[in-house]
Swiss-Prot record:
UniProt membrane topology term: Single-pass membrane protein
Positions bearing carbohydrate: N32, N42, N60, N69, N103, N262
Residues with PTM Phosphotyrosine: Y417, Y517
Chain sites annotated for binding ATP: L350, G351, Q352, G353, G354, F355, G356, E357, V358, K372
UniProt name for this protein: Putative cysteine-rich receptor-like protein kinase 20
Top-level taxon: Eukaryota
Species, as recorded: Arabidopsis thaliana
Chain's gene name: CRK20
UniProt lineage: Eukaryota, Viridiplantae, Streptophyta, Embryophyta, Tracheophyta
Residue numbers bearing the Phosphothreonine modification: T509
Pfam families: PK_Tyr_Ser-Thr (PF07714), Stress-antifung (PF01657)
Major localization class: membrane
Keyword Coiled coil: no
């Protein structure tokens, strides 16, 4: 009986061993031989290649780390090579796979100097070029599962797969092994699994670039797919494929014979298989549960219904937004934002304002957005923040930058805007090498577009919005150089008082601020009108308001300088020299006149934006005589003349004293 019991144990052991061994057999997938360069069988290169392959498949190779590179010979017959095993396989599986790939390499590519071989558990590569620590994405291959996605539209399926795969790519690029897996839900009944891996000798950025290219090459019209590139691989499928081949060879063990009668044999013969099946069942669900906890999760591009594809075509112009817009329909997933901005990589930083930093973000489908990461001293709670975002998102006009949505994650508050490609107006306006791209005709259209955008905020939108920080840096230019006003509504979103006429916290940029706002915190639509006037003068002159400094005993800024030219009857001296003779004097003089009306000290004297738009579009409208501007700065000569009434002066207007270090209104 004991021999029978031993036989049963040996049978079970051999069955399990053979099952495991069969699962471990390296599975060939694909190879690529470069036919551009070859070698002869008896050449030095052939000898060096065999030396290299022997080194990579030796007993002392780095199977425990799953990666090794090597070099053999000297130029011009030098060979460089490497192997890479899947990040979660055991050293035994890695060694077995590399041994097989080395043995088969010379038969698959008998005379080619450069080749790459892909197996389920490993990859082998060699070349006559230096391929070590070098990104290579040429000569890849894409494979697909034969079945179509189940009850999911293709664009939605693509979104569901791309986002977690790109997040896994970021995780892999930041890890030492350059390897990561993920699991995500396709629907309530089905999950998908993903895996990405680079060669560990790549830099973090090269690894991420390679994986993103690999992931984006997939068509995502099947339930599973994989891409092989020389420097990286990616795969997704509807089963947990990355756990099929990660078990090492079992340790040898000999069952001990037991004693007993027929009942013992029957019990053992029945209990052992049942026990084995039960243990396998428990192990399966334990692993499944553990994997569920540690995966980077089911992360659709958005937490709710909105799809990434919906932000690719923002409306050119609408009246007052969409009444069905809700906070939920605008909410982005934080991990999607992190992935789109490459973890807020400094190279993606577009700028920084008073409310936070702005980054360029690119979603896997290629959609680009501007991501504003708000400062953490916002006065809003989450609910209030969401409500204000909904209000601002409804403000849609062709001369306003569209707010696409927001994101909340812990202390993080993020706004997502449409991406405007041509940077801001100040980038072109104040750079002598770029000014030529903005001739007068184009600048005149920009002035009109800005005016229409502000008019919409003041009058045509459902709620009156006062910008409070209108400046050249907040005017973005689209691909056709059309202006789009940015950062409107930030006072509402940031939790600042927008309904009262006074505020203790003044936000904005000095030089653009109206006197009553800068000094006393009093703001109104006329505060924006003042800023618009300063902006028009900058557009006409190509100079910053603050660029004029104390020279030859005079103290000046652009507003003061313009007023003096106007008073002296020589406003044409303000015109940007880059225009040459390509402008209409009457048109440009009218713009200067309108700007001076906007920067008058008394807010009641300034025109409304509605009147300004009419002045710009209808040349027959007579313009009022402008009064002295706010923040008018006196020269030393003017101060002396005012101190000595006996001097012969032309008292055009009354001017209060001010200094360049302590600017004050009249």
């Amino acid at each position: 009986m004991s021999s029978l019991i031993c036989f049963i144990f040996l049978f079970l052991f051999s069955f399990i061993t053979s099952f495991t061994a069969s699962a471990q057999n390296p599975f060939y997938l694909y190879h690529n031989c470069s036919i551009t360069t070859t070698y002869s069988s008896n050449s030095t290169y052939s000898t060096n290649l065999k030396t290299l392959l022997s080194s990579l498949s030796s007993r002392n190779a780095s199977y425990s780390t799953g990666f090794q590179n090597a070099t053999a010979g000297q130029a011009p017959d030098m060979v460089t090579g490497l192997f890479l095993c899947r990040g979660n396989v055991s050293p035994e599986v890695c060694r077995s796979c590399i041994a097989l790939s080395v043995n088969e390499s010379l038969s698959r590519c008998p005379n080619e100097r450069e080749a790459v071989f892909y197996y389920e558990q490993c990859m082998l590569r060699y070349s006559n070029r230096n391929i070590l620590s070098t990104l290579n994405t040429d000569g890849g291959v894409f494979m697909q599962n034969a079945r179509n996605p189940i009850s999911v539209k293709q664009d939605r399926f693509r979104d569901l797969v791309l986002n977690p795969m790109n997040l896994a790519a970021i995780e892999a690029a930041r890890s030492i092994k350059r390897f990561a897996v993920t699991k995500f839900d396709l629907n309530a009944l089905q999950s998908l699994y993903g895996m990405v891996q680079c060669t560990p000798d790549l830099t973090e950025q090269d690894c991420l670039d390679c994986l993103q290219q690999s992931i984006n090459q997939v068509t995502y019209d099947k339930i599973g797919g994989r891409t092989f590139l020389p420097s990286c691989t990616s795969r997704y499928d509807n089963y947990e494929f990355y756990n099929e081949f990660n078990v090492g060879t079992p340790q040898d063990s000999s069952p001990r014979p037991g004693k007993g009668g027929n009942s013992s044999v029957i019990v053992i013969a029945v209990v052992v298989p049942i026990t084995v099946l039960f243990l396998l069942f428990v192990a399966f669900f334990s692993v499944r549960r553990a994997k569920r906890k540690k995966t980077i999760g089911a992360i659709p591009l958005f937490k709710v219904k909105r799809k990434e594809t919906e932000v690719t075509e923002p409306p050119a112009e609408t009246t007052d937004g969409d009444d069905i817009t809700t906070a939920g329909s605008l909410q982005f997933d934080f991990k999607a934002i992190v992935a789109a901005t490459d973890i807020f990589l400094p190279i993606n930083k577009l700028g920084q304002g008073g409310f936070g930093e702005v980054y360029k973000g690119t979603f896997p489908s290629g959609v680009q957005v501007a991501v504003k990461r708000l400062s953490k001293n916002s006065g809003q709670g989450e609910k209030e923040f969401e409500n204000e975002v909904v209000v601002v998102a409804k403000l849609q006009h062709r001369n306003l930058v569209k707010l696409l949505g927001y994101c909340l994650e812990g202390e993080e508050k993020i706004l997502v805007y449409e991406f405007v490609p041509n940077k801001s107006l100040d980038y072109f306006l104040f750079d002598p090498t770029m000014q030529g791209q903005l001739d007068w005709s184009r600048r005149y259209k920009i002035i009109g577009g800005i005016a229409r955008g502000i008019l919409y905020l003041h009058q045509d939108s459902r709620l009156t919005i006062i910008h409070r920080d209108l400046k050249a840096g907040n005017i973005l230019l689209d691909a056709d150089m059309n202006p789009k006003v940015a950062d409107f509504g930030m006072a509402r979103i940031f939790g600042m008082d927008q309904t009262e006429a006074n505020t203790r916290r003044v936000v904005g940029t000095y030089g653009y601020m109206a006197p009553e706002y800068a000094m006393y915190g009093k703001f109104s639509m006329k505060s924006d009108v003042y800023s618009f006037g300063v902006l028009v003068l900058e557009i006409v002159s190509g100079m910053k308001n603050s660029s004029l400094d104390q020279m030859d005993g005079s103290i000046s800024n652009l507003v003061t300088y313009t007023w003096r030219l106007w008073s002296n009857g020589s406003p044409s001296e303000l015109v940007d020299p880059s225009f040459g003779d390509n402008y209409q004097t009457s048109e440009i003089t009218r713009c200067i006149h309108i700007a001076l009306l906007c920067v008058q000290e008394d807010a009641n004297d300034r025109p409304t934006m509605s009147a300004i738009v009419q002045m710009l579009t209808t040349s027959s409208i007579a313009l009022a005589v402008p009064r002295p501007p706010g923040f008018f700065l006196r020269s030393k000569q003017e101060q002396a003349e005012r101190a000595c009434p006996s001097m012969d002066t032309s008292d055009l207007f009354s001017i209060d004293e001010a200094s360049i270090t302590s600017v004050a209104p009249r």
